[in-house]
């Protein structure tokens, strides 16, 4: 999961780096990306994409997958629809016994007691949580995340320019 559709160069660079890292670990890995622009995502990253708003396709892809990676970039938990959507994805993965990894995400300020509780519940059901800054770490601890949270650098800092340029 990530916000890969609006041609945001930072998010696209993060996605590129995550894809390259995964392919270094397993060159035969089959990666699918949730996107609103399937052709653009394929052209830029050479991976198949599924419409993030097509719940049926997402469920089918999650059922076929080993894991869901919630990818880098700032995650905005200000809108109820986003929180509910993420809760649905995490719950679906749990029901299907799929591993969930939040990788190098940034977590913005979460306000409101109910939003904090829902986000804490969601993050406490994620298998591995890796954030890209100490603010995000502190925010997750503040809202009640009991799971281990690791801090890493933003993946874009290790971005390597390749033949398919995003810049």
Model-derived segments and spans:
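Aromatic- and Gly/Pro-rich donor/ligand-binding loops
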Residues: 1-111, 121, 156-157, 162, ...
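A nucleotide-sugar donor-handling region in carbohydrate enzymes
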Residues: 113-167
């Amino acid at each position: 999961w990530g916000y890969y559709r609006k041609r945001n160069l930072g998010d696209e660079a993060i996605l590129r780096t995550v894809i390259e890292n995964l392919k270094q670990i397993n060159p035969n890995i089959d990666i699918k990306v949730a996107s609103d622009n399937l052709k653009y995502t394929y052209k830029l990253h050479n991976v198949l994409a599924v419409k993030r708003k097509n719940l049926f396709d997402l469920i089918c892809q999650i059922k076929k997958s080993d894991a869901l990676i919630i990818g880098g970039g700032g995650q905005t938990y200000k809108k109820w629809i986003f929180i509910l959507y993420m809760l649905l994805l995490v719950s679906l993965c749990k029901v299907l016994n799929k591993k969930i990894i939040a990788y190098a995400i940034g977590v913005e300020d979460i306000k409101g007691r109910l939003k904090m509780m829902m986000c804490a519940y969601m993050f406490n059901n994620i298998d591995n949580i890796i954030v890209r800054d100490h603010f995000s770490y502190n925010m997750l601890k503040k809202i009640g995340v009991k799971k281990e949270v690791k801090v890493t650098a933003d993946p874009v800092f290790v971005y390597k320019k390749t033949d398919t340029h995003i810049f």
